[in-house]
């Protein structure tokens, strides 16, 4: 079977004959696409005649064009079909045909074919712009996680932490400063969480409104490598140095552990961490003082009923000694028939005793209960009996003299 030359096939397709070293404007012999769809060709020169309006001799009678014409071919599918409509093609056929034609139309080293193939594989410009807008508008993963737990992110950024290994390399950490501490998250983990969010967002838009609650809860799961430096365990922020474009500082924990950080000088992470730590300590001290005061007030409110029960107890012994002076005045008439001893206290007043005053006036003395007579009158009589052994001899002579005189 003899193969028809390329010039005849080009004339059948409606293109002028080839002259010189000009490349064919379109792959030879391609008249129909995948599934029997007719393919039309366009060029910058005269428009080719459709198949329905073309005769067998039209290709030979067409005028020739100059060799300087540059052909730019683009494939497209016609809107009308043949009288015998073929079955509908699968969805991937359009991409296959357009990609094949774009790669073969411009020749082996054509830049246009590469660009067209690249454009076919890339998403449309509107989709990429919408993704960028979603990324800029959407809050980061860690910030949304903190908001769900009730904390507020005061500052977010990247800090470099010195590793604990032998090499002590600087590793970047995504840091979030809150009112209660500093959160450290590996940057790879944050990127992974953001990718999961972007994958879940288009699924949520097509799903029913009742279904997105499930992925939203799962996306807020805490990361596995999250490290928190709480202000309650933090002691100081020390060793602040500026070298080059970095600022170096050390966070000293309560257990004695030291963690080295560095950041650009214009960010001022050390000042922010110190300020929030001092404010946290002040809040805790105020809460401690308030709690102690509330405990004291609570104890004071419970004490008054107990004091009322204790007060009636000392009143009872005060009532008991009162009937004693009422019963004991009976022996008072006994010293009355002795008039002589009552006249003799005058010479006894000449003697100076070290403590005569406590017995002259009645007052609640601690040894008042030891005396059987709390009344003020029997005190002179008691003084006589108390000092009788000291002056027994002169009193005895006086008594004898008085008896002799009376006799």
Swiss-Prot record:
Matching SMART domains: PH
MF annotations from Gene Ontology: phosphatidylinositol phosphate binding
Conditions for induction: Induced by FGF in a hippocampal progenitor cell line. Induced by FGF and EGF in a CNS neuronal cell line.
Record domain PH: where: 149-184
Key words, A-Z: Apoptosis, Cytoplasm, Cytoplasmic vesicle, Nucleus, Repeat
Recorded GO CC terms: cytoplasmic vesicle; nucleolus; nucleus
Region (Disordered): 1-67, 188-224, 296-407
Subcellular location field: Cytoplasm; Cytoplasmic vesicle; Nucleus, Nucleolus
Chain intervals for the UniProt region annotation (15 X 2 AA repeats of P-Q): 312-348
Basic residues biased stretches: 354-384
Compositionally biased tracts (Pro residues): 320-344
UniProt feature, compositional bias: Basic and acidic residues: 1-11, 54-63
11 X 2 AA repeats of P-H: annotated segments: 354-381
Gene Ontology biological-process annotations: apoptotic process; forebrain neuron differentiation; positive regulation of apoptotic process; response to aldosterone
Signal sequence interval, chain numbering: none
Bias type Low complexity, positions: 189-204, 297-319, 385-395
Highest taxon of the lineage: Eukaryota
Subunit structure, interactors included: Interacts with RPL14, EIF3S7 and PABPC4.
Functional description taken from the UniProt entry: Seems to be involved in regulation of apoptosis. May be involved in detachment-mediated programmed cell death. May mediate apoptosis during neuronal development. May be involved in regulation of anti-apoptotic effects of IGF1. May be involved in translational regulation.
Protein name: Pleckstrin homology-like domain family A member 1
Gene name for this UniProt entry: Phlda1
């Amino acid at each position: 079977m003899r193969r028809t030359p390329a010039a005849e096939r080009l004339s059948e397709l409606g293109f002028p004959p080839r002259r010189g070293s000009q490349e064919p404007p379109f792959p030879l012999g391609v008249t129909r696409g995948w599934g029997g769809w007719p393919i039309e060709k366009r060029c910058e020169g005269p428009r080719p005649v459709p198949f329905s309006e073309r005769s067998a001799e039209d290709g030979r009678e067409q005028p020739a064009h100059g060799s300087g014409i540059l052909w730019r071919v683009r494939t497209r599918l016609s809107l009308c079909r043949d009288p015998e409509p073929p079955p509908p093609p699968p969805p991937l056929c359009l991409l296959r045909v357009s990609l094949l034609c774009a790669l073969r139309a411009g020749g082996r080293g054509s830049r246009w074919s590469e660009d067209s193939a690249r454009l076919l594989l890339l998403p449309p410009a509107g989709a990429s712009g919408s993704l960028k807008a979603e990324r800029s508008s959407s809050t980061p993963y860690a910030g949304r996680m903190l908001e769900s737990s009730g904390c507020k992110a005061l500052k977010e950024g990247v800090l470099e932490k010195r590793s604990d290994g032998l090499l002590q390399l600087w590793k970047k950490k995504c840091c979030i400063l809150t009112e209660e501490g500093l959160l450290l998250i590996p940057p790879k983990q944050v990127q992974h969480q953001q990718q999961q969010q972007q994958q879940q967002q288009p699924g949520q838009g097509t799903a029913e409104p009742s279904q997105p609650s499930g992925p939203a809860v799962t996306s807020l799961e805490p990361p596995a490598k999250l490290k928190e430096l709480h202000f309650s365990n933090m002691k100081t922020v020390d060793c602040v140095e500026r070298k080059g474009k970095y600022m170096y500082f050390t966070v000293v924990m309560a257990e004695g552990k030291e963690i080295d950080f560095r950041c650009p000088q214009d960010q001022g992470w050390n000042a922010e961490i110190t300020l929030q730590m001092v404010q946290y300590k002040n809040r805790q001290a105020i809460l401690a003082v308030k709690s102690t005061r509330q405990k004291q007030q609570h104890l004071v409110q419970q004490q008054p009923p107990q004091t009322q029960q204790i007060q009636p107890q000392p009143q009872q012994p005060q009532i008991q000694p009162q009937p004693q002076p009422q019963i004991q005045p009976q022996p008072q008439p006994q010293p009355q028939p002795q008039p002589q001893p009552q006249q003799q206290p005058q010479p006894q007043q000449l003697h100076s005793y070290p403590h005569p005053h406590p017995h002259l006036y009645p007052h609640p003395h601690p040894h008042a209960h030891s005396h059987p007579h709390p009344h003020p009158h029997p005190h002179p009589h008691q003084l006589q009996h108390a000092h009788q052994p000291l002056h027994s001899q002169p009193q005895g002579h006086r008594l004898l003299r008085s008896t002799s005189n009376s006799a």
